[in-house]
Amino acid sequence: MPNRGVVLLDGQALAYNIEKDLKNKIQIITAQTHKRPKLAVILVGKDPASITYVNMKIKACQRVGMDFDLKTLKENITEAELLSLIKDYNTDQNISGILVQLPLPRSIDTKMILEAIDPNKDVDGFHPLNIGKLCTQKESFLPATPMGVMRLLEHYHIEIKGKDVAIIGASNIIGKPLSMLMLNAGASVSVCHILTKDISFYTKNADIVCVGVGKPDLIKASMLKKGAVVVDIGINHLNDGRIVGDVDFINAQKIAGFITPVPKGVGPMTIVSLLENTLIAFEKQQRKGF
């Protein structure tokens, strides 16, 4: 029997409400300035998952009235060509934010590409300058997924200060920035990765468990503390057509106090956080007369 007291962290519903607010703000801004925020999206290659994610972001832009410029590039594009495009976007006053859909082909140096983006247009929050500001608690663009996770927890009034948090996955995109946000919020944070000997040691003692590594059913119910907050950031496409996370959701909800579903949990919050960052970038650029 499912835990009747478990609360589903409904990212889709929250994202919908945030989108409504964004749409209203953009309408007001457009009426006042006759300008709209504009997101530049760069897609390299034909990876099915990347195409799906880009389409979701474009549709979200359309829903809130945000302009976008999509560049779909062949997989054999050179680094020099890609850098040239980013340079053009950096200097284009009509572009508020720049997003390079990851992963890039192996032939391209992802780190170099991300570092080429103007930090003031880095709405994904991946530029070293923005990551450094995050670590030192200075105002910066936060990576969209960690930002969405924190917003979701805040919405459900989940206390972070003084809590033990286990983060499974140490990527630059999710695990590392999320650990800094949790630390900045007053949590004691343990980050587990591929070399961690016993993940369950950390998860069993954690008040909040966040996982995003791309392995279905990695986190079992037996690995959780009763009443824990479980944030499933994983997205896995199974052969039978189902989309699942990294947590054994059916059994974990019998133990957890709060849990995100997959889909409709963290995913929608990631996209709406990207839109929020783009609007923030636009407003900053307008204040500077850019």
Swiss-Prot record:
One GO CC annotation: cytosol
Highest taxon of source: Bacteria
Disulfide bridges in this chain: none
Involved pathway(s): One-carbon metabolism; tetrahydrofolate interconversion
Reaction(s) catalysed by this chain's protein: (6R)-5,10-methylene-5,6,7,8-tetrahydrofolate + NADP(+) = (6R)-5,10-methenyltetrahydrofolate + NADPH; (6R)-5,10-methenyltetrahydrofolate + H2O = (6R)-10-formyltetrahydrofolate + H(+)
SUPFAM superfamilies: Aminoacid dehydrogenase-like, N-terminal domain, NAD(P)-binding Rossmann-fold domains
Positions of NADP(+) binding: G169, A170, S171, I194, I235
One protein family per Pfam: THF_DHG_CYH
Complexes and interactors: Homodimer.
Protein family (similarity comment): Belongs to the tetrahydrofolate dehydrogenase/cyclohydrolase family.
Stored NCBIfam families: PRK10792.1, PRK14191.1
Name of the protein described by the UniProt record: Bifunctional protein FolD
Organism: Helicobacter pylori (strain J99 / ATCC 700824)
